[in-house]
From Swiss-Prot:
Subunit relationships: The biotin-dependent acyl-CoA carboxylase complex is composed of AccA3, which contains the biotin carboxylase (BC) and biotin carboxyl carrier protein (BCCP) domains, and AccD5, which contains the carboxyl transferase (CT) domain.
Catalytic activity, EC: 2.1.3.15, 2.1.3.-
Reactions the enzyme catalyzes: N(6)-carboxybiotinyl-L-lysyl-[protein] + acetyl-CoA = N(6)-biotinyl-L-lysyl-[protein] + malonyl-CoA; N(6)-carboxybiotinyl-L-lysyl-[protein] + propanoyl-CoA = methylmalonyl-CoA + N(6)-biotinyl-L-lysyl-[protein]
Entry annotated with the keyword Transferase: yes
Record-linked PROSITE patterns: COA_CT_CTER, COA_CT_NTER
Record's protein name: Biotin-dependent acetyl-/propionyl-coenzyme A carboxylase beta5 subunit
Disordered as annotated region, ranges: 1-23
All residue ranges annotated as the CoA carboxyltransferase C-terminal domain in the record: 295-541
Compositional bias segments (type: Basic and acidic residues): 7-21
A GO molecular function held by the record: transferase activity
Cellular component, GO annotation: acetyl-CoA carboxylase complex
Gene that this polypeptide is encoded by: accD5
Gene3D superfamilies for the chain: 2-enoyl-CoA Hydratase, Chain A, domain 1
């Protein structure tokens, strides 16, 4: 209910609006104030209420929720589209459907844009696209991370090819910024058509479960063309892109969870490729490593099972090596490999680890591509890479071969061999065959290679090797009527004792040290300090030819 006082105030405001004299300084200021107020709610309060009714925030509220309080500086708030086709000239909301600007997160500068689905459905037109291009170029020029909050429905059809041209400019800027500044995309609604390619070109994609979707063609088009019936969530929801496509790096439980994840993610990343990632002050330990062991360090000595075929959770190793939290990336995708960020001695590191609880830690197509992308991300932004290895090989099967395990597995080889950041490898158990080479071997350019006494470094495991190495002996025994199974077990044990251990590799320098598991954190810490001034020189080239 509106009071008499409120009605009087509103009448006064309307009177003021009608009597603004834009030929005076006071009038010009009043006109600016009016336009700025209008830009806050370009399509009215009803649209805002509808957004809130869905449990969502508006484009502007999302920026406020992510950035430090009162840090946002808006750009192009008064921009309007210039199109007159299809009666668009009768509706020209301020901002044209996207809020752009810059601010801070934990005191660090970032550039940002947030798409507004209440304005033309969040569709991209000429001015909308120009605003995004402008803030992209500002981020590149100033060396600041760029965060895009996406909630739009493709190109603005009424504006025709100009929308497609702006998409292309946005995509090109994503490419130019790649490896120069961190680019993070949050998907907060249904992103379709051209709206999905820009996020796909960025470093990290965060989605919200049951709220955000990404797809090129929607369910209606798919049904018309192929006859398939699928919901938006099944087609392009957060779970789909986390577990199946690998497009999403994190599936948030809600919008605030997504913002919290971005804030934590940025704490591990530098503002650009010319600087180092932020570190926390941590005093270097004094004295020998064995005099600085913690209870968590000592727990590593009993973590590996006696049986080489019994799995263990590699997360148990990771959490005991890091200072505090482990920020896992793509946790729901290719779970046979674990990647993410943490800190050791206050320094950010990227962890790449085989996971014995999934496919026994074997590398497959998805795991290879997941790890390769993460390794390249770390290398872009000067983050040391720590490999934790327990890999019996590449996953066998016709499905893997037909779908390109040779070419796609080579991506991890390429990414690791090309990386120039400090590279440290710890072999916890199995390191067999070609997978040993891929997972940070000495001759692939690893700087410091460590192995636990439980490490098994060989061309293949004992059960497979016996059939090759002792083929003639087994055949003769079979012809003589001997117990083949008993002989095979004895030969397997002989092979394991001779070759399946870390000491042959250590004798030849493929392993720099065989260490107690409890000493691992200390060794990694000293290696990181040593490699801080690592100098890497690569042959001059335009760019390499990654096996895409």
């Amino acid at each position: 209910m509106t009071s008499v006082t409120d009605r009087s105030a509103h009448s006064a405001e309307r009177s003021t609006e009608h009597t603004i004299d834009i030929h005076t300084t006071a009038g010009k200021l009043a006109e600016l104030h009016k336009r700025r107020e209008e830009s806050l709610h370009p399509v009215g309060e009803d649209a805002v209420e509808k957004v809130h009714a869905k449990g969502k925030l508006t484009a502007r509220e999302r920026i406020y929720a992510l950035l430090d309080e009162d840090s946002f500086v808006e750009l192009d708030a008064l921009a309007k589209h210039r199109s007159t086709n299809f009666n668009l000239g009768e509706k020209r909301p301020l901002g044209d459907g996207v809020v752009t600007g810059y601010g801070t997160i934990d005191g660090r500068d970032v550039c940002i844009f947030s798409q507004d689905a209440t304005v033309f459905g969040g569709s991209l037109g000429e001015v909308y696209g120009e605003k995004i291009v402008k803030v992209q170029e500002l981020a590149i020029k100033t060396g600041r991370p760029l965060i895009g909050i996406n909630d739009g429905a493709g190109a603005r059809i009424q504006e025709g090819v100009v929308s497609l041209g702006l998409y292309s400019r946005i995509f090109r800027n994503n490419i130019l910024a790649s490896g120069v500044i961190p680019q993070i995309s949050l998907i907060m609604g249904a992103a379709a058509g051209g709206h999905v390619y820009s996020p796909a070109l960025t470093d990290f994609v965060i989605m919200v479960d049951q709220t955000s979707q990404m797809f090129i063609t929607g369910p209606d088009v798919i049904k018309t063309v192929t006859g398939e019936e699928v919901t938006m969530e099944e087609l392009g929801g957060a779970h789909t892109h986390m577990a199946k496509s690998g497009t999403a790096h994190y599936a948030a439980s809600g919008e605030q969870d997504a913002f919290d994840y971005v804030r934590e993610l940025l704490s591990y990343l530098p503002p650009n490729n010319s600087t180092d990632a932020p570190r926390y002050q941590a005093a270097a330990p004094t004295g020998p490593i064995e005099e600085n062991l913690t209870d968590e360090d000592l727990e590593l000595d009993t973590l590996i099972p006696d049986s080489p075929n019994q799995p263990y959770d590699m997360h148990e190793v990771i959490t005991r090596l890091l200072d505090d939290e482990f920020l896992e990336i793509q946790a729901g995708y290719a779970q046979n490999i674990v990647v993410g960020f943490g800190r050791i001695g206050g320094r950010p590191v990227g962890i790449v680890a085989n996971q014995p609880t999934h496919f026994a830690g074997c590398l497959d197509i998805n795991a290879s591509e997941k790890a390769a992308r993460f390794v390249r991300t770390c290398d872009c932004f000067n983050i040391p890479i720590v490999m934790l290895v327990d890999v019996p090989g590449f996953l066998p099967g016709t499905d893997q071969e037909y779908n390109g395990i040779i070419r796609r597995g080579a991506k991890l080889l390429y990414a690791y061999g090309e990386a120039t950041v400090p590279k440290i490898t710890v072999i916890t158990r199995k390191a067999y065959g070609g997978a040993y080479c891929v997972m940070g071997s000495k001759d692939m350019g690893c700087d410091v290679n460590l192995a636990w006494p439980t490490a098994q470094i060989a061309v293949m495991g004992a059960s497979g090797a016996v059939g090759f190495v002792y083929r003639q002996q087994l055949a003769e025994a079979a012809a003589n009527g001997e117990d083949i199974d008993k002989l095979r077990l004895r030969l397997q044990q002989e092979y394991e004792d001779t070759l399946v251990n870390p000491y042959v590799a250590a004798e030849r320098g493929y392993v720099d040290a065989v260490i107690p598991p409890s000493h691992t954190r200390g060794y990694i810490g000293t290696a990181l300090r040593l490699l801080e001034r690592k100098i890497a020189q690569l042959p001059p080239k335009k760019h390499g030819n990654v096996p895409l």
